[in-house]
Amino acid sequence: MRIVKLTAESKKGLLEDLLQRSPNHYGQYESAVAEIIEMVKKGGDEALFSYTEKFDHCKMDAAHIRVTREEIDEAYQKVDADFVEVMKKSAANIRAFHEKQLRNSWFDPKPDGTILGMKILPIAIAGVYVPGGKAAYPSSVLMNVLPAKVAGVERIIMTTPPGADGKVNPGTLVAAHIAGVDEIYKVGGAQAIAAMAFGTQSIPKVDKITGPGNIFVALAKKACFGYVSIDSIAGPSEILVIADETANPRYVAADLLSQAEHDELASAILITTSKTLADQVSIEVDRFVANLSRREIIEKSLNNYGYILLVDSLDEAADTANEIASEHLEILTKDPFAMMTKIRNAGAIFLGEYSSEPLGDYFAGPNHVLPTNGTARFFSPLNVDDFLKKTSIISYSRPALEKIHQDIECFAENEGLTAHANSIRVRFEKED
């Protein structure tokens, strides 16, 4: 890995480099995605099946688009029993963590008869997109579905692309069953996002779409936002490690590679105050890469977006981390909790040498759907709140309104909205 002494100039170049990975820079695909969305919006199932045959090489029809109970049972036979148990344990952890996020409706009555409050209810239908093929990750099913279940969403549907044989990845189906998905449809890509956003004869229109996907899926979610709520427009995976001289270089190297193997656009960055550690980590990375199954992807990823940044102090490391606002941030320092207090921007923070990033990917319980490409500055991980909607409640008695009605009329008149003022004034007209 390249080792760079961090300066104002090198930091500027690094940040510009990382931002080029954003889906907002994939403009050349937007017209193709827009065409797919429009065709599905107008053509419904017919367009959906046509695109499924074109992109997934699978002939699909209304009779076979929905996964049956028999197909789920068959999937259980194909998935290792030990893995099924591991998924159940993971699901229990995810559910327990997200249950702590639940919020109830509240009301605040006053002695004068005023009642203010917030009515909190789950959305009616959630749609989860799950990639297929080599990118089929059962963990994504659990992480996207379980917060919706905890929130109380009554109907959760899932779309995932079929193989040429019309089958869906068995691990994906088992995870969906464990998580409690109500309906699973064999359709993928931008066409699946369009189907959930606008509805077709076979697939219902949903209130919110979540889940990862390729460039086309990301752009489709972006284009459909406003017609439907979405979780985020996720970019490539990223990890940033802050480490000092106390860190184990093998641990640091292994953790950097855990994200670099995702794809060629993934970023893996170490920020350290120790030149010795920097050199050791670089050596360990080379040793690990030689024996990893996704070596080619890792090498391209590190060549594109792999950095070891040398800084003068941990305060400088924290400042840089806050500017990058990484999806995953590991802190491997003498006092990681003290270091954590200096971090404002990160999707998830992993503290200490036994809190490796994959712990969060699979098992700990916090959601692994995290903001990327610097959006941790203003976005949060997927959570129960994403599947809840809130409605303000306002109730005033006549005496309560009478005390303030002139204030409201004054406000309305100063904004030039006389009908607003009249709506209040008319309630206190003297009867003849």
Protein language model features and the residues they cover:
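N-terminal Rossmann-like NAD(P)+-binding subdomain of aldehyde/semialdehyde dehydrogenases
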Residues: 1-124
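Short acidic-hydrophobic, aromatic-tinged amphipathic segments that line or gate anion-handling sites
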Residues: 3-9, 183-188, 308-313
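Conserved small-residue-rich beta-alpha loop and adjacent elements
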Residues: 108-174
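Short internal beta-strands
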Residues: 154-163, 268-274, 281, 352
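Conserved NAD(P)+-binding/catalytic subdomain of aldehyde/semialdehyde dehydrogenases
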Residues: 180-258, 262-267
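A glycine- and small/hydrophobic-rich beta-loop-beta segment
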Residues: 262, 270-346
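C-terminal core of ALDH-fold dehydrogenases
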Residues: 322-432
